Curated annotation (Swiss-Prot):
Residues that hold 2-[(2R,5Z)-2-carboxy-4-methylthiazol-5(2H)-ylidene]ethyl phosphate according to the record: 138-140, 168
Protein name (Swiss-Prot/TrEMBL): Thiamine-phosphate synthase
Cofactor: how bound: Binds 1 Mg(2+) ion per subunit.
Residues reported in the UniProt entry to bind 4-amino-2-methyl-5-(diphosphooxymethyl)pyrimidine: 41-45, 73, 111, 141
GO BP terms: thiamine biosynthetic process; thiamine diphosphate biosynthetic process
EC number: 2.5.1.3
Pathway terms, separated by semicolons: Cofactor biosynthesis; thiamine diphosphate biosynthesis; thiamine phosphate from 4-amino-2-methyl-5-diphosphomethylpyrimidine and 4-methyl-5-(2-phosphoethyl)-thiazole: step 1/1
HAMAP family documented for this protein: TMP_synthase
Transmembrane stretches, start-end: none
Cofactor entry: Mg(2+)
InterPro entries: Aldolase_TIM, ThiamineP_synth_sf, ThiamineP_synth_TenI, TMP_synthase
GO terms for MF: magnesium ion binding; thiamine-phosphate diphosphorylase activity
GO cellular component, one term: cytoplasm
């Protein structure tokens, strides 16, 4: 996976925890049409595998239309079934080496929290990108680890892999992460749960 410099497609969009209604797919298409998004990750922790498959098929078509890479959270087998572009692995998910056997040359990213040691292991195991966070407080998931801006500078000294920043990213703080060398920003709540802006308006504010 090629590393992006700061550009207009720095958003790594994550789905809401639950697909709210049928209108979500229209909102997603509008957001992806903004041309600010490189990746979309389907993250539905509480859905059945069957529902994930049904939802994933719909979303994959939308991602393909807008040339956005479609990734699955935690589940390499589902990613293979959907012929997704790859998957994202947390530290408690399937081992990266096992996931690579399933997904071959697909994109596999790994959560590294705030740890350079976890990042080094992921690099050695063949990760395509590294994710650090949470950088800020977030309501999307329970935060067990907080990351500092210094980890972004430190990781850049040892790898050229793309770096994804995660956690509580919104209009008031996103530029600081880009200026500190994050290649992509994983964003969810700011887009889907924004009380001030609709999804398309919210994504357009990120310039």
């Amino acid at each position: 996976m090629k590393q992006n410099k700061i550009n207009k497609k720095f958003v790594y969009l994550i789905s809401p925890n639950k697909i709210p209604d049928i209108n979500f797919y229209d909102d997603l298409a509008l957001v992806l049409s903004s041309k600010k998004i490189s990746f979309f990750q389907l993250r539905l922790k509480k859905e059945t595998n069957l529902n994930k498959l049904i939802i994933g098929k719909k979303i994959k078509k939308i991602c393909n239309k807008h040339k956005v890479k479609f990734l699955i959270n935690d589940d390499p087998l589902l990613a293979k079934k959907l012929n997704a572009d790859g998957c994202h692995l947390g530290q408690k998910d399937m081992d990266l080496i096992k996931a690579r056997k399933i997904l071959k040359n697909k994109i596999i990213g790994v959560t590294c929290h705030n740890s350079i040691n976890l990042a080094k292991k992921a690099i050695n195991d063949g990760a395509d990108y590294l994710a650090f966070g949470a950088f800020y407080a977030t309501k999307t998931k329970t935060v067990k680890y907080r990351a500092s801006l210094t980890v972004l500078k430190s990781i850049k000294k040892i790898t050229s892999l793309p770096i994804v920043a995660i956690g509580g990213i919104k209009l008031s703080n996103y530029k600081k992460l880009l200026l500190n060398k994050a290649n992509f920003l994983a964003i969810s709540g700011y887009i889907w749960n924004n009380k001030k802006y609709k999804p398309l308006e919210a994504i357009r504010k990120l310039k």
